[in-house]
């Protein structure tokens, strides 16, 4: 759950990829500055990697191993009794001989730091690059071959978690990241900045013009945009963010904090989650990897109501037990006794799955090469010209053979009944992963 902050004394930042300064208060974020060191000088902050609902993540130099690592500083409120720490330890306790182990971003170290806003947990893991959401988007796409490779790794990663009796719970394109090439570790900080650019900073300011104080840093730092430097990225992925993870034997009884576009219908309506709901999210991820957009997230707003509208438009009518369920003003399922709640109204199959698959664009011929360690060579831009028909640019779609094969895979994943969905081994063995595209 995201940290709930009070009305902020700080002005919002004008930068895009930064945390909300309002989160710098007691119970909130720990103020981190470039050049600071932690754990008796072992980890030195070099750049910013990202921020989330209750954390900031920084690129740091590990002087002991001469590598760059990620330091995730959790809000002090979330650090207290941090329930995900056991899950992270369990995930990292497996053997690297197990299939899928290599595609999980394992916990390398953990420590606590005291600051003006409280007692903060810091999690150390391998530093990673851009996410699938960044690379497979409106601006960038993966080639067909790269899509198969990345999707196959995602299946293997999820299989590893399930073999430990753990569900990820938030298996989305934002939580699947590409690894950085080893050359990054050979760079000192000045050389790192020469490649990535100097950190973009903006001073933190108060609303009344008073001094910032100790609770906030003197400046916020914009996160690195690794999608802009694909030469640093490998085609190998790692899965991150286990905040929504749970034991298969003891699933949560409330709705997961997963983006609704990736939630299965039973997770939305009945809060029933498990292996099958992870498989549904995997199906959403596979479509995003191949197409560059979310199958159930391009209509309305970011609520379960609109996600379900897209599901109905794509897959057809909901099972009878869900058809008359009502939704509150925020788009979440409401109690049947709430007469003010709204019933889902949508024409089924307005945008069927088969059409969505047929409309996936393929990369221009000759745009990809066989070097599996070079992600840059596997990425293309949708604006690339394919050729001209009657003086107008034409778009090339994936072949009918691939469309039929991919549709077969996805249609067997996106089943309303969880027990009817493909298992992970069946997905891994599906012909689409071996198709020459």
What spans do the regions from the language model cover?
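Intrinsically disordered, low-complexity regulatory segments of kinases
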Residues: 1-437
């Amino acid at each position: 759950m995201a940290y709930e902050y009070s009305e902020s004394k700080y002005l919002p930042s004008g930068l895009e990829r930064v945390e909300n300064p309002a989160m710098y208060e007691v119970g909130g974020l720990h103020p981190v500055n470039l050049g600071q060191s932690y754990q008796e000088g072992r980890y030195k902050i070099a750049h910013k990697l990202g921020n989330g609902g209750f954390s900031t993540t920084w690129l740091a130099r590990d002087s002991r191993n001469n590598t760059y690592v990620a330091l995730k500083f959790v809000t002090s409120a979330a650090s207290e009794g941090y329930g995900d720490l056991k899950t992270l330890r369990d995930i990292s306790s497996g053997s690297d001989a197990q299939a899928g182990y290599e595609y999980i971003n394992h916990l390398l170290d953990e420590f606590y730091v005291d600051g003006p806003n409280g007692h903060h947990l810091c999690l150390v893991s391998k530093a990673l690059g851009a996410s699938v959401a960044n690379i497979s988007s409106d601006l960038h796409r993966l080639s067909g071959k790269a899509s198969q490779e990345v999707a196959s790794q995602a299946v293997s990663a999820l299989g590893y978690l399930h073999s430990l009796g753990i569900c990820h719970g938030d298996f989305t394109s934002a939580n699947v990241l590409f690894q950085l090439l080893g050359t990054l570790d050979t760079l000192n900080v000045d050389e790192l900045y020469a490649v990535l650019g100097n950190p973009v900073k903006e001073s933190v300011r108060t609303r009344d013009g008073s001094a910032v104080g100790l609770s906030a840093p003197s400046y916020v730092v914009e996160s690195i945009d690794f999608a802009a430097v694909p030469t640093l990225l490998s085609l190998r992925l790692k899965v991150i963010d286990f905040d929504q993870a749970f034991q298969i034997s003891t699933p949560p009884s409330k709705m997961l904090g997963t983006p609704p576009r990736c939630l299965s219908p039973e997770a939305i309506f009945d809060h029933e989650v498990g292996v099958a709901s992870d498989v549904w999210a995997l199906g959403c991820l596979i479509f995003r990897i191949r197409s560059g957009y979310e199958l159930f997230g391009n209509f309305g707003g970011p609520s379960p109501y609109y996600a379900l509208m897209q599901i109905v438009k794509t897959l057809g009518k909901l099972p009878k037990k869900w058809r008359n369920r009502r939704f509150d003003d925020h788009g979440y399922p409401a109690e049947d006794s709430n007469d003010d709640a709204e019933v889902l109204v949508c024409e089924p199959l307005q945008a069927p799955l088969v059409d969505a698959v047929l409309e996936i664009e393929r990369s221009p011929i000759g745009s990809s090469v066989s070097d599996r360690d070079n992600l840059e060579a596997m990425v293309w831009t949708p604006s690339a010209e394919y050729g001209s028909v009657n003086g107008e640019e034409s778009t090339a779609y994936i072949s009918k053979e691939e469309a039929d094969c991919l549709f077969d895979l996805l249609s067997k994943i996106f089943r309303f009944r969880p027990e009817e969905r493909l298992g992970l081994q069946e997905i891994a063995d599906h012909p689409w992963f071996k198709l020459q595209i």
